Amino acid sequence: MESIVDTEDTIAAIASAISLGKGGIAVIRVTGEEAINSCKNIVETKSKYAWESHRVFHGYVKDNLENKYIDEILISVMHSPNSFTGEDVVELHCHGGVIVVNKVMDTLLSNNNKVRIANPGEFSQRAFLNGKIDLTQAESINQLINAKNLKSAEIAFNGVKGEIKKKIDVIKNDLIEQLSEIEARVDFEEDFSDFNYHDFSRSIKNIKEKIEILIENTKRGASIHNGISIALIGKTNVGKSSLLNLLSKKEKAIVTNIPGTTRDMIEVNLTIKDIPIKLVDTAGIRDTDEYIENIGIEKTFEMIQKSDYIIYLYSLEDGFNKDDEEIISKIPREKLITILGNKKDLIDSKKNDQKTFSSDIVLMSIKNNEGEKDLVDKIVKKCGSKEFENIDIFLNERQISNLRDCLKNLNDTDPIIANQLPFDLLSIEVRDGIKNLSRITGQELTEDLLNNIFSKFCIGK
């Protein structure tokens, strides 16, 4: 597509993660018209493959201003247009210590006045502007980088492969077919029989159903991307923090016998039997005059409303009492909920509260790791992976907004059809619907919107 932002500069960025300060290898990526020449200025090599496209060769980085060698590296080169960005691209593979990679980066910039540091997402932005990827692929790359679990990464990669665009194009082509029919009739009305509003309505209804399915699947897909939110709820000292540590296999929460230890929510992302979970430990609910603890309890009740699934813990030693009943009464009926009786080890095995409930109770001794399998089986049954079997793409808020705008355009054809108004009025709504679908893949964009989208990417991508 025609460039609507400046792509003339040669840009560079550290493309690998070095946040821990060390690593075996770090990669500096350079793209643009001066990418190869700028790297030639700081690289000494004797390789016979030097600077050939799609070759990797050995060399040394030299700071010519200080006349010092900086690092021993490997260099990979991709000539335009056969690169990620569609421009000349050079990648410098240097040693991964943060000091070394920053010095190599500084050397590249200081020895070349035609190279600048890339903005966030600028490499992907250039790939999009140069027609190497569509906008949904670019956004899927960002989702893949930020995936919190394996299933989310798999779905994001489907977007990278172009699966989102394929689904949008199917809907768009259906609308283009309807628009072509209308506009042909407008231009050559005498060559056609009367317009069949019923057939048109049926076609539009089928298209709307496809859009609604995409939107509905994305709601479920959001649970994969973010993790099904499971809130651990209960009074103080019933084992919520211990359960979080047990399921996450890490000491994420402080566990004491002092009531009210957890003042704020602790979140852990994990996967249980291929199901992505966001487990949230909340402040124990009790009457207290402690100001900060009360804030935590307020957040607990907010989490009850926001979560997908609630595990309510109580102490088998104390029994299920009116306080527990009162708390559970505040949980919306539509919420998935499992009752967990903890401290099984402290009671007579013949006397338990299992008969108190018709179903959905799990008895555990979290301290002794008894009953974990029963709880996991319950979670899998409630949130089973079958819920996600048909989810193969994930749409972000921008894409969903464009889909809803398209759906509104199609809904606005209903009164035109119902009143059999001049059929050329339908073309306005159908054409606007096509434009909204085109915005999803990037054919209809403003510079400000484009910059906003890519500003959310990491630097170097």
UniProtKB/Swiss-Prot annotation:
Positions of Mg(2+) binding: 241, 262
Cofactor, how bound (note): Binds 1 potassium ion per subunit.
Top EC class of this enzyme: hydrolase
EC annotation from Swiss-Prot or TrEMBL: 3.6.-.-
Main location group: cytoplasm
Cofactor(s) needed: K(+)
Any one GO BP annotation for this protein: tRNA methylation
Function summary: Exhibits a very high intrinsic GTPase hydrolysis rate. Involved in the addition of a carboxymethylaminomethyl (cmnm) group at the wobble position (U34) of certain tRNAs, forming tRNA-cmnm(5)s(2)U34.
Protein name: tRNA modification GTPase MnmE
UniProt organism field: Prochlorococcus marinus (strain MIT 9515)
